Amino acid sequence: STEEVYELVKGYGEAARRSMEAVVDAVEIHMAHGYLVSTFMSPRTNKRVDEFGGCFENRMRFSRLIIEEIKKQTEGKIAVLARINSDDEVPGGLDVHDSAAIAAYLESCGLDAIHVSRAVHIKDEYMWAPTVIHGGFSAELVEEIKRAVNIPVITVGRYTEPQFAELMVKEGRCDLVAFGRQSLADPHMPKKAKEERLEDMIPCIACLQGCVANMYAGKPLCCLTNPFLGHDAEPLKQAETPKKIMVIGGGVAGLCAAFVAKERGHEVTLYEAGEKLGGNMRLAAYPPGKGDITNMIRSYIHRCQKD
């Protein structure tokens, strides 16, 4: 009902106030991916006949009231961001021209920065971006939204190469780049990039197996390329008595066992019967769109060879 919408607006403000009391610097309102606020914005899903439906301003009223309520309850002491779609990717949904207008409107409502994602759940290949979708796949759409506003624009969408992310900012196509799954694979990636240690970076191969699949299953996140995910703050226990260790088999499991033992202080020799390392994962990289798997193999080999 209309009354319930106003109750929801109040709830957003109260949540932001609690966040401020917990000493956060900013809050982000989720207005993307077909979630609640997003459904008000789109004429495809908003069929209301009250003041929250119909024309553009009515469909944006919920968003505007949320921003105003958050600003009121936090007294403007924290930044307010919003995440929107660049394109819903469904017939009758919002396209990039709609989203540019939405971004400009949100700026006029007092928004401090805008975070641009893409697609709704029924077109979720553009939400999760598996390996068949190239990195930075929404760059052109983000650029169009950037031209419509003066506030900082954040882009997201399978950015795995820091060189490309840096280029996006340098060329003025966005102001910041968000790293999601790549931060799970390697939370130290920005530091390594700054120090020009690109070979040391652990790649995200967009397999979705340990992150998105586990999220939907209600399980703890894990990562195929980063076996230490969730234990990053725990130092690798050094061996009290270093040993000479022989690892037989140069597939990814053998490579991982070898570099972990090496990093614990053991002297490790890796044996592989074939001519090349990587095992069956090399075959897995051959189907179309699966080439990024070789980045994982290359990373593991580098960790074994590194002094």
Enumerate the language-model features and the residues they cover.
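N-terminal glycine-rich dinucleotide-binding loop that anchors FAD/FMN and/or NAD(P) in oxidoreductases
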Residues: M201, A284-D307
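Flavin-dependent oxidoreductase catalytic cores
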Residues: S1-I248, V252-V268, K276, N280
